[in-house]
Structures are given as structure tokens and as C-alpha cells.
Amino acid sequence: MRWTLLSEHPEEIARGAVFQFPARWPYEETVEFMLAELPPGADDRMGLIVTTGHKAGLWVVSLPDEAYAAGRPWALSASWLRDNWTAKVHVETDLEKILVCTDYSPSQQHG
């Protein structure tokens, strides 16, 4: 599992990617959001869901058509996310502290 700064991430970010960043109430000190595909028939195609803490499982935002990478209906544009994160996703985020993991796997810490 490898984390990359969003500011240095290549152009496409596919569903299943996880974003980790420092946060505060209503989240914990660090929160993770996963890029998830919406079910068929939904108005939008993808969005972000909280995967950690007491807000885990809650939907954060559906992403607009302009968020997608050109010609890639199930991948987001990293540059769109960088340009729109504070307006569309989480206003209180330092963009230089957002990490992205595209090969997220279960924790190896379970006994």
C-alpha cells in the first residue's frame, strides 16, 4: 500500500482510491474517504464515502461530470480534485496534506 500526495498524483484516480487527510470535528484527527461508484440509476456516477471513525459509512459528496478524467467514465481527474477539493469536498483541508492510495488493502494489524 503506497500513499501519494494529491498534489503529486498522476492525472487519473480510479474508484476504490482512498484519500487520507487531517481533519477535525465532526471527524477525527485523521479521516479517510473512499471514491465509490453509485448504484445504477443514480443521478451521478461516483462520489466519496467516509471509511473511518464514527462517521464511517456516511456519504460525503456526489461528484459532477466535470470531475471525471477525459474518456474515462470511472476515473476522476486529479487536477479537477486539486482545483475543487475545498469548494466541493472538504473546505477545511490543507491541500498539501491530502494523501491518495490507489492500491488500498485491509490492515495487516489484525491478530
What are the language-model segments listed below?
Residues 52-111:
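Intrinsically disordered, low-complexity, charged/polar segments
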